[in-house]
Amino acid sequence: MTPSTSDARSRRRSAEPFLWLLFSAGGMVTALVAPVLLLLFGLAFPLGWLDAPDHGHLLAMVRNPITKLVVLVLVVLALFHAAHRFRFVLDHGLQLGRFDRVIALWCYGMAVLGSATAGWMLLTM
């Protein structure tokens, strides 16, 4: 075994590729879904362009297990996308790289907390 091989095996694996995956998936999902939801619930329904669904219908939709799963995935990916973006804004934009561990822990911790809260809210609905 060469020294470089043993060094490579002894190093800890980074979670960075997984975090970049969540970032890109969250950005893609948010870019595709958020504008449609904003158009529908922010303009089309309030301005009367489309007939607004009643509260009972929306509640029945959200109580469907498949809809709950889709909403949870959307929220989790959007939160991790925002956490990753905010982390790198603080790290590179504001030059706070010396606090990277604290910033990463806080950003991703808030994303996990928000994801858990969303999951709990969807489960108890």
Swiss-Prot record:
Protein's cellular compartments: Cell membrane
GO biological process: fumarate metabolic process
Residue ranges of the TM segments: 29-49, 64-84, 102-122
InterPro entries attached to this UniProt entry: Fumarate_red_D, SQR/QFR_C/D
S-S bridge residues: none
Keywords assigned by UniProt, alphabetized: Cell membrane, Membrane, Transmembrane, Transmembrane helix
One Pfam family linked to the record: Fumarate_red_D
Membrane topology note: Multi-pass membrane protein
GO molecular function: succinate dehydrogenase activity
An annotated GO cellular component: fumarate reductase complex
Signal peptide (from-to): none
Entry superkingdom: Bacteria
Entry's family note: Belongs to the FrdD family.
Record function comment: Anchors the catalytic components of the fumarate reductase complex to the cell membrane, binds quinones.
Quaternary organization: Part of an enzyme complex containing four subunits: a flavoprotein (FrdA), an iron-sulfur protein (FrdB), and two hydrophobic anchor proteins (FrdC and FrdD).
Protein known as: Fumarate reductase subunit D
Species for this entry: Mycobacterium tuberculosis (strain ATCC 25177 / H37Ra)
Encoding gene, per UniProt annotation: frdD
